[in-house]
Amino acid sequence: MLALTPLPIFDDNYIWVLHDDRHALAVDPGLAAPLERFLAGRGLQLAALLVTHHHHDHTGGLAGLVAARPGLPVYGPARVAGVNRPLTGGETVTALGRDFDVLAVPGHTLDHLAYHAAPWLFCGDTLFAAGCGRLFEGTPAQMHASLSRLAALPGDTLVCCTHEYTLSNLKFARAVEPGNADLRERETVEQARRARGLPTLPSSMALERATNPYLRCAEPGVIGAARHHGAIDDTGEEVLAAIRRWKDTF
């Protein structure tokens, strides 16, 4: 039986740690020391690392973790320093006895990857709870295609993104779809969690499909909001582009 732990680092990042009582898999280790303390406190051996993209808050701990463990498998995009098992999407990674499908999800970065082994989806900065990542390298068309691919996963998929942005994302989502009752209910639930010092993650794909505006680009309310903020047509990529630009200055 595998347990999942969101390990907080920086102001709003999580290192995701999947583990049994002996071994652990960690995703996007932006810092080494908190993960080392977690492993030592539970007597866990680090079996592998998964990296979604090259940004430092996801990779800063790689050098220290690998230096202490020569030969440790580090999976991720080839341009990430420290990756020794380069991936591009379409592969399968086996760790802790589970097979993870590697998904190419460009948008936030061009070589962004996600890892899926039911019920877990480790999606980095592509899909957030009630949001999506900024388009630093990719195009709206790429991000729309990537999010559509993730949205097609089963509803009980656990969405393990890497930032605690949920409340701010929900505030924006309410501006996009003020009449969405599911959004109002979710905001109440997540505010209560944060008030108790609890993470809002993981989310579920069913919840994201009901409340995440970037997965709802075909909904009339989202299209209308996008048109009001500069969309020139009703295609998914144009709607996403308009609401993502709006969010960048919200």
Locate predicted features.
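Conserved beta-strand hairpin/beta-sheet module of binuclear metal-dependent hydrolase folds
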Residues: M1-R42, L113-F128
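Divalent metal-coordination and catalytic microenvironments
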Residues: L18, D28, H53, V105-H108, ...
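Active-site-adjacent loop/tail segments of enzyme domains
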Residues: G131-T157
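Accessory terminal helices/loops
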Residues: S148-T157, L167-F250
